[in-house]
């Protein structure tokens, strides 16, 4: 299956928190979008691997994406080496996305920066013909995405561009709340974590509101790029 956009997250819920409004918008425009989670979040303080698997499946259904995979890398301990790069390369060649979106370049959680660099490096390597990979016994064609973008997570990073998600904020919120084990609930006996504080989900709204304010819309998501953003004409900019 060829995808238009492939989004990566170090953990289940990274993509939802960072760019699910943009994903929902692209799906509504007829684009085929997939999500690949690097780990199952097994080191997370709250919930369990099994619960998070179920939550990820529910979030995927809410977003209407075409495919979701988990690479089962070690939470907290995966590294940017040949073995891990090859796992990413195989998926890039399998789905042949034009656009790849991945974790923030740097962030509070060490896996976010690591995952970002791992995916970015794999996107480049995936275009090298002398790196040979197979899928279901068939040699894969080389493929390099046209662009790699990074969503913004815990740290307040200055975006290179923002996407208007005003009509999709409700879907973004629903996809985030699909991960009920990870966020604040009065009925939960689980420990409080940085993302399980009472106001965390509200802070996501505030950020999207602020990005939206800067471009004159209700809600927006910010991204950073690895190269200049090109437009065909000034009319493409709003």
Features from the language model and the residues they span:
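Active-site rim/loop-helix segments in enzyme catalytic domains that contact anionic ligands
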Residues: 1-95, 224, 235-236
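Metal-dependent de-N-acetylase/amidase catalytic core
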Residues: 2-6, 82-238
